[in-house]
């Protein structure tokens, strides 16, 4: 006879196990045996996902009236399941996590009742996602225990929020807003200010103004309305230590980033740069990030996307980045390295340079940072020769002639190099031959050691 080892586990352990699966499956275990019948109240994580319910396809030949009726039944089956489950758990202990994903349900009053029930039961983590626009009743949208909140797509805070300075979630540390439509520009900032303990903020919304005195980590993806040139962007976060910002470039920036240590920037131009036959450009470019770069000039770690390299070159007067010790860039065959000489010259204390992909657009403005165009032997001192970089990390190396030429350029110019780490592009052929070619390159630094990772 087979032994049911799981059923012999203590109740609290079984409750934890059931909390790891979707609530529909957890509820279904109650019919397995008497042992499982009363375990559902021990579940401390509720995951109501409408896609987990069974929606049978319409039968062939079903008339329009029957199709509508069956559609209505399918539409409400999810709601009945949630209502029944919450009723069974009315006397259960704390609900640590409550996740609600609605794709057909549009009964706002009923959904707000579910949310209110979760918050009243001391919920620590709340995830809300909807396909339809569903307002959350702001009058009851408050909790003294909530630590993590995620709102996505159709859900949005409705009604009238508390006055500016009012507190909604005094314990909230992590807030994520994805494609959430606030009823006014000010409302999103009222909402953020209602979370005084906030430490981590993820925003995927169109915005021009964001302020939080205490938040330490912010990720902003604001890629909407790319046809509308944004006049300005305001970011007041004096306690921020990490910024991940992805957006089209603004006309100007008004920022307070006094504590910033690390920045990951993906800034894009509204119009692509048009080069003439000589690889030069002569068009006017919208945007000015000078104030933004001035505000982050004391950072230690900087990551730049291929588009950001363009924006840094065309849209700012680059200040000296005295404290920058780690610079990471990503290349693209359609984007040039024009800013690299300026960026390296303005980073006098740079220790680590990370380059993801060596292939980039060939222009006459890359200077001596790359080996794409042979420079005349007039020689001014190379920006690489003045660079104090000790660690060079190359990712996605494919071993092409252009890549090998650039590796030769780096190894022959960077005088302070001690370690070179090369990550080979996945699927690259002739790996032994590729490694041998790099290892055979001359090195200006006698301390330079090459590692393949």
UniProtKB/Swiss-Prot annotation:
The keyword Nucleotide-binding does not apply. Pfam families: F-box, LRR_At5g56370. Residues 3-51 form the F-box domain. Keywords: Ubl conjugation pathway. One of its GO terms (biological process) is protein ubiquitination. Pathway: Protein modification; protein ubiquitination. GO terms for cellular component: cytoplasm; nucleus. It comes from the Eukaryota. Part of a SCF (ASK-cullin-F-box) protein ligase complex. The F-box is necessary for the interaction with ASK proteins. Interacts with ASK4. Component of SCF(ASK-cullin-F-box) E3 ubiquitin ligase complexes, which may mediate the ubiquitination and subsequent proteasomal degradation of target proteins. This is F-box protein At4g27050. It comes from Arabidopsis thaliana. The lineage of its organism: Eukaryota, Viridiplantae, Streptophyta, Embryophyta, Tracheophyta.
């Amino acid at each position: 006879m087979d032994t049911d080892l799981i059923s012999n586990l203590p109740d609290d352990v079984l409750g934890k196990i059931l909390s790891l699966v979707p609530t529909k499956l957890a509820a279904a275990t109650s019919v397995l045996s008497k042992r499982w019948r009363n375990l559902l109240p021990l579940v401390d994580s509720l995951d109501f996902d409408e896609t987990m319910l069974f929606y049978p396809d319409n039968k062939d030949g079903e008339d329009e009236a029957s199709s509508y009726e069956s559609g209505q039944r399918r539409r409400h089956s999810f709601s009945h399941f949630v209502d029944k489950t919450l009723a069974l758990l009315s006397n259960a202990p704390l609900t640590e996590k409550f996740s609600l994903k609605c794709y057909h349900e549009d009964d706002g009053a009923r959904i707000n009742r579910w949310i209110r029930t979760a918050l009243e039961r001391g919920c620590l983590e709340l995830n809300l996602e909807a396909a339809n626009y569903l307002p959350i009743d702001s009058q009851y949208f408050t909790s003294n225990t909530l630590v993590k909140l995620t709102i996505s797509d159709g859900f949005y805070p409705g009604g009238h929020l508390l006055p500016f300075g009012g507190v909604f979630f005094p314990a909230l540390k992590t807030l994520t807003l994805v494609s959430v439509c606030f009823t006014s520009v000010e409302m999103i900032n009222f909402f953020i200010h209602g979370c005084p303990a906030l430490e981590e903020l993820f925003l995927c919304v169109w915005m021009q103004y964001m302020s939080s005195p205490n938040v330490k980590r912010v990720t902003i993806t604001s890629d909407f309305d790319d046809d509308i040139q944004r006049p300005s962007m305001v970011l007041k976060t004096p306690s921020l230590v990490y910024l991940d910002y992805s957006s089209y470039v603004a006309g100007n920036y008004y920022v307070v980033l006094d504590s910033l240590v690390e920045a990951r920037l993906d800034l894009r131009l509204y119009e692509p740069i048009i080069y003439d036959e000589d690889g030069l450009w002569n068009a006017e470019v919208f945007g000015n990030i000078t104030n933004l770069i001035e505000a982050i000039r004391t950072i230690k770690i900087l990551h730049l996307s291929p588009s950001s390299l363009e924006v840094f070159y065309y849209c700012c007067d680059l200040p000296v980045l005295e404290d920058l010790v780690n610079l990471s860039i990503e290349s693209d065959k359609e984007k040039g390295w024009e800013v690299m000489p300026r960026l390296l010259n303005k980073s006098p204390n740079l220790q680590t340079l990370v380059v993801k992909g060596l292939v980039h657009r060939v222009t006459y403005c890359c200077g001596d940072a790359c080996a794409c165009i042979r420079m005349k032997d007039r020689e001014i001192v190379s920006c690489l020769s003045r660079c104090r970089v000790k660690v060079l990390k190359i990712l996605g190396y494919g071993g092409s002639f252009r890549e090998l030429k650039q590796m030769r350029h780096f190894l022959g110019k960077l005088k302070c190099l001690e370690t070179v780490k090369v990550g080979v592009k996945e699927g690259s052929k002739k790996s032994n031959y590729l490694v041998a070619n790099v290892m055979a390159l001359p090195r200006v630094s006698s301390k330079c050691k090459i590692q393949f990772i």
